[in-house]
Amino acid sequence: MSCTLDHLIAQWTRLGVAFSAPSAKESPDLERLLLNTARRAPQNARVFILAVTWLCRYGDLVARHRLKRLVADELELEYRPVLGMLLATVREETGTAHFNAVIRDCPPADEAAPLFEIERKNEKLRRLAERHAAPISRQWNLWARAFRPKDEALRPVRWILERNPGYRIRADLKGDLRASIIAALADDPRAGESEVRLSRCCGATRSAVRDSLDDLETAGRIKRSHVGRRRRISLTGMELKNRAHGRRRSVRVANN
């Protein structure tokens, strides 16, 4: 589901990005935040630059299997080039292969044009955007100048995890399939109704999901129970407590 630019900025503020804006009241669904960033970034260059900056430092928090599935299921075709360019810029800056599978599902725009709306609407700015476009932006047919990540605009990881305790397991799991399972159980309605449904939500095979569930159950992160002929999966009290703690903390911060 899409969101307004103001709400998007509030969510990034919650994740430690230095926007002059109030923070969101709850931790964002990180993978859907990236989809909404692709939708709204053309309206605001700072959003694009700081999203790249955040992912360069904290990209391992993203559950990459789930992101790939959400791109296929929820992100409109017109915004996939924006997400592809965003993630490819992160890859170029860091050398990470974390987002390769997602990038492959995000083709370049059909027609070359400026990335940012303000430059599309003005012929002079449009010509300047084309003239000064960075090589990577030309690959995506979305002209934009080269830039350097703004590391000074980010809070440290400790700050982020204190305010978003549900992200701690993301930090532990480095965005692998187990992270996608936890994120799906937390944010996708009915994901835990069966292994088949959970596999679809994570964009992975049932066999791979089952192996990851074994690991998560051993670690006390999830529990499985039989409901009729199905095997239902849910977060344990430990994970639910982490998420509830994050919501309570946001209320205290807002009231101070």
Predicted regions and their residues:
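Short acidic, hydrophobic short linear motifs in intrinsically disordered regions
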Residues: 181, 189-201
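Short amphipathic alpha-helical interaction segments
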Residues: 203-219
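A short, conserved structural fragment
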Residues: 217-228
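Minor-groove-contacting beta-hairpin "wing" of winged helix-turn-helix DNA-binding domains
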Residues: 229-237
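Short, amphipathic alpha-helical interaction segments positioned at domain boundaries
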Residues: 237-256
